Amino acid sequence: MPHSQTSAPRDSLAGVRLARGASPWLLPTVATAAVSLLRARRSGTAKAVAVPATALAAGMLWFFRDPEREITQGRVVSPADGVVQSIMPWKDGRTRVAIFMSPLNVHVNRAPLAGTVTSVEHVPGGFVPAFNKESENNERVVWHFDTELGDIEMIQIAGAVARRIVPYVPQGTKVEQGERVGLIRFGSRVDLYLPEGVEVDVEVGQKTVAGVTRIDRD
């Protein structure tokens, strides 16, 4: 049974469910496409603009999609759609699972466990491509959740194009597992730190679906 979502209403356009925070990018693109299509029959310039503008608008609609998910019942679920880029033991005994999100993935991130958001910290930084090691110094938002497994850290990392991270919930919010917590625009990465003793049940190269793919093993 999926968990209920109690977050504020998302942006919408023509019945398409869109990610919150999409409007500043999407509305001008769709408006340009609509105007150029209306004028295409009377203007050669508008006709020339209509095709790429419409293609760009369609791409934006696809990128900012925010599908409903039936949340998997398990201790830890993936916070992001994408591909597992690396699984690394950390000095403090935790395990870091890094998930790379391409521009083709859904970029709405979800809570890996139910709990309380104890910290949401924006850290300024660069914009190196998210698949590079140097991306660890990129602009990012660091989350901490108080859960049944203790403190869970999740980091949203901006990429070369993804220069805007949009948190959906503030510190102190109680979230359900799989609840939407934020958006990263245009290609990026999410790092999830599992506490010592939690065994990973995904492997490098494996595709993940936010709220659906189980990350840990019983």
From Swiss-Prot:
Give a yes or no for keyword Lipid metabolism in this entry. Answer: yes
- Where does the UniProt entry say this protein principally localizes? membrane
Q: Which cofactor does it need?
A: pyruvate
Q: Which GO terms describe its cellular component?
A: plasma membrane
UniProt EC number: 4.1.1.65
Q: Which reaction does it catalyse?
A: a 1,2-diacyl-sn-glycero-3-phospho-L-serine + H(+) = a 1,2-diacyl-sn-glycero-3-phosphoethanolamine + CO2
Gene name, per UniProt, is psd
Natural source organism: Streptomyces coelicolor (strain ATCC BAA-471 / A3(2) / M145)
Q: Where in the cell is it found?
A: Cell membrane
Q: Extract the NCBIfam families matched here.
A: PRK05305.2-3, PRK05305.2-5
Instruction: Write down the PANTHER family for this protein, in alphabetical order.
Output: ARCHAETIDYLSERINE DECARBOXYLASE PROENZYME-RELATED
Instruction: List every position bearing Pyruvic acid (Ser).
Output: 188
Q: Which UniProt keywords apply?
A: Cell membrane, Decarboxylase, Lipid biosynthesis, Lipid metabolism, Lyase, Membrane, Phospholipid biosynthesis, Phospholipid metabolism, Pyruvate, Zymogen
Q: Which GO terms describe its molecular function?
A: phosphatidylserine decarboxylase activity
The record's Pfam families line, in alphabetical order, gives: PS_Dcarbxylase (PF02666)
Keyword Lipid biosynthesis assigned: yes
Which family does the record assign?
A: Belongs to the phosphatidylserine decarboxylase family. PSD-A subfamily.
- How is it modified post-translationally? Is synthesized initially as an inactive proenzyme. Formation of the active enzyme involves a self-maturation process in which the active site pyruvoyl group is generated from an internal serine residue via an autocatalytic post-translational modification. Two non-identical subunits are generated from the proenzyme in this reaction, and the pyruvate is formed at the N-terminus of the alpha chain, which is derived from the carboxyl end of the proenzyme.
The name this protein carries in UniProt is: Phosphatidylserine decarboxylase proenzyme
Which catalytic residues are annotated?
A: 188 (schiff-base intermediate with substrate)
Annotated site residues (Cleavage (non-hydrolytic)) in this chain: 187-188
Q: Which top-level enzyme class is recorded in the Swiss-Prot or TrEMBL entry?
A: lyase
